[in-house]
Amino acid sequence: MNALTAVKANTDDLAQRHTGFILAPSAQSPRLLALTFTADTTRQFLHQVAQWPVQALEYKSFLRFKIGKILDDLCGNQLQPLLIKTLLNRAQGALLISAEGIDDVAQAEEMVKLATAVAHLIGRSNYDAMSGQYYARFVVKNVDNSDSYLRQPHRVMELHNDGTYVEEVTDYVLMMKIDEQNMEGGNSLLLHLDDWEHLESFFTHPLARRVMRWAAPPSKNVSHDVWHPVFDVDQQGRPVMRYIDQFVQPKDFEEGVWLSELSDALETSQNILSVPVPVGKFLLINNLFWLHGRDRFTPHPDLRRELMRQRGYFAYAASHYQTHQ
């Protein structure tokens, strides 16, 4: 079910003259669009939201939607419909977003505001138990002793979906680069489910829809297990996935062997995209049919990367998708 060659950029959206931002195909795939806010839009947005520190967004959740409206208004109210259309479009479902003039760790608060505004034009970001907020910021360094692969720099973090060990609906994932020092490697890895060469054989396997147990390590601050299958379907009957190799707990030999084979088949796909994400940029993907991971870094004693993530549910046209709940 490799559909990559059949994918064409949405010429209507790409050819349209947009207010406040530029839209273009990414260098990696026509499925991934690159959206850049102009310098003037960036300047006006930051000026209008300067009265609210990030703490205000944490304490008053409605402000997250207010700053989203400010950004959409600056874009002639063209931004929100385009974001929703792109993320719900099975042929795309992914954006690499940046803003001219936001590219330095000293602007970390501004980065959080921008990402929050974008996310709350499509839905709402869920509570993140790891941080205790609607977003999480975390650092990758040269040495790591944590209990998951999230911060381990010298190995590939395998392809996965987010939201596998929580009960909240996780339709989208946003991943932003806040800082990077002494870095080489570590590109984001993406795989669209329809481009995976082995989708048909795994999706039609008897274990594909079997309910399995998912459990997170202590650092995730989630105390109970959840139960769901690896695969499901959307309302059009197309495969969607909810999978991460670290947290699935096979109950027997049959499940363990199948999950191991599934992991190997994902990691050896020839259609994995390697996407550099510079400081200030962020990826926004549909979590149901995109998997994401991270390539390894080259060791350096002063290696440092800071990331910010948000993940949540679509508030528009959500009935188009099953959510495994």
Swiss-Prot record:
The gene is glaH. Its EC number is 1.14.11.64. Pathway: Amino-acid degradation. Fe cation binds at residues 160, 162, 292. Belongs to the glutarate hydroxylase family. NCBIfam families: PRK02963.1. Transmembrane segments: none annotated. Binds 1 Fe(2+) ion per subunit. It catalyses: glutarate + 2-oxoglutarate + O2 = (S)-2-hydroxyglutarate + succinate + CO2. It comes from the Bacteria. Coiled coil: none annotated. One of its GO terms (biological process) is L-lysine catabolic process. This is Glutarate 2-hydroxylase. Acts as an alpha-ketoglutarate-dependent dioxygenase catalyzing hydroxylation of glutarate (GA) to L-2-hydroxyglutarate (L2HG). Functions in a L-lysine degradation pathway that proceeds via cadaverine, glutarate and L-2-hydroxyglutarate. Keywords: Dioxygenase, Iron, Metal-binding, Oxidoreductase.
